[in-house]
């Protein structure tokens, strides 16, 4: 985990994955996702896939939105709040805000499809 966190800090995107799956075509994607404050994850959705996040360290806000980009709900994943994970159902717009250096375990169905192909919500958040 320390090496993945170090790579995230050095990455221009301020995040780095360590994949447990062998191929982007695998049917189940399981990964560590090291994320740093300031990383930008667009509001996106996965039309046919649920996505699960489990916090291993740090603090992350997971937000969901409607089709107009209006906030619907949020959860702050961290050990202090005793909220360790969340499942985002398929086709739900969502994003993450990294509140402190964090490590997540992430799981979703494969194969990999870039956000640009699955859907990015182009709105300006208020």
Annotate each predicted stretch with a short phrase.
Residues 12, 70-76, 80, 93-126:
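Double-stranded beta-helix
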Residues 48-68:
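Glycine- and acidic-residue-biased ligand/ion/polar-headgroup-sensing regions
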Residues 32, 52, 95:
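Short, surface-exposed charged micro-motifs
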Residues 32-47:
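Conserved short histidine dyad/triad with adjacent acidic residue
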Residues 43-44, 62-64, 85-88, 94-99, ...:
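Short beta-strand His + acidic residue motifs that chelate non-heme Fe in jelly-roll/DSBH
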Residues 39, 48-49, 92, 100:
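A generic "binding-loop/recognition-motif" signal
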Residues 1-27, 73-79, 124-126:
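A short, N-terminal "cap"/entry segment at the start of jelly-roll beta-barrel domains
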